[in-house]
């Protein structure tokens, strides 16, 4: 399906130069002189290579339609994730590299959404937030104000995040999986 380049969004799958690409980032740039253009960072689905491409906002690109399917993560088998279809209980292998930076947030029995193009997996979406435990947190530096100061902390999955000074080791917090940022203390 053809669409204007300025409608490209992260997560979409497009066809360009005879290859399939998944869009990682996009930014519309409006220079002081001349027309606006869109800068797109994308990854080749077959080779995994990344590239940047620029289009004028009026250009058209071929967007591939994706099917979204719900699966449950079972376990990791080498370089693949084993997912289970909740309706048919069939197991489905997906390359682990599709997760990218979100891989540490994958937990047993987590519900995930897999994007498929003609039956081939092209992307995995985790829930927007996960609850994890703080295993290590720096002490609060005396004299810091609570309004804008954050301190580093290490989560149970090994990811480091910046948390408010009142958070201590042993507490459970909610973390945004997209960018590894602190959201709030876990309730309950």
UniProtKB/Swiss-Prot annotation:
CDD domains per UniProt: S1_EF-P_repeat_1 (cd04470), S1_EF-P_repeat_2 (cd05794)
Q: Which SMART domains does the protein's record reference?
A: EFP, Elong-fact-P_C
Subcellular location(s): the record lists: Cytoplasm
Q: Which residues form a coiled coil?
A: none
Please tell me where this protein is predominantly located. cytoplasm
Query: What GO terms in the biological process aspect are recorded for it?
Result: peptide biosynthetic process
Q: What pathway annotation does it carry?
A: Protein biosynthesis; polypeptide chain elongation
Q: Which GO terms describe its cellular component?
A: cytoplasm
Keyword Translocase on entry: no
Q: Name one GO molecular function term.
A: translation elongation factor activity
Q: What does this protein do?
A: Involved in peptide bond synthesis. Stimulates efficient translation and peptide-bond synthesis on native or reconstituted 70S ribosomes in vitro. Probably functions indirectly by altering the affinity of the ribosome for aminoacyl-tRNA, thus increasing their reactivity as acceptors for peptidyl transferase.
State the family it belongs to: Belongs to the elongation factor P family.
From the Swiss-Prot or TrEMBL record, give the protein name: Elongation factor P
Recorded source organism is Acidiphilium cryptum (strain JF-5)
